[in-house]
Amino acid sequence: MKVSNFLLSLLSLTAAATSIPQSRSVSAVEPATSAECCPFTYKPTCTKNLERVYHIKLFYNRKEGITPEQFNAYWANNHTKTAGDFHLRFGVYKYSQYHSTPELRDLLRVPGGAPVFEFDGAAEFWVPTMETFQAMGSDPFYRDVITRDENNFIDHSSMRMIVGFDYIMVDNQNAVTEHGRTFQ
């Protein structure tokens, strides 16, 4: 499905006409605990905590012979049963599955637009240290059980990784003015 220039200009007009809420700035003195941080309440300390950890993304495509629907269903419903406790055991702060279908990627294809990243999904991990992530990858349970399960739905030859830090500018419709990391 292609997005026409008309729809793009309509989206721009709609965004311009929408009233933007005033940003709030709250001073953070004490770091918040994970129990105090939730996606429905803006707390600067929660944002600062997230900016201090490593954010790793693994992009990959589905195994040949399975549909996007089969890939997404298996990953969301089966693989999480195998991998969930494993991630908790290593102290992963957050694990998120990013599901992308060909139809969703087609929505990005516009004349003159940037090339679309052709991956069916990405697993995202927020970990306290790189050693945490490396230990996960070398753990026998990962090698023997999780990798075997991934073979049911992932084309391992397509896998690509990136690591970095989040630098959050807007959180829950609030401008973020205090950061857990600085870039100089």
For every predicted segment, state its role:
Residues 1-22:
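Fungal secretory targeting signals
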Residues 18-184:
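Macromolecular interaction modules
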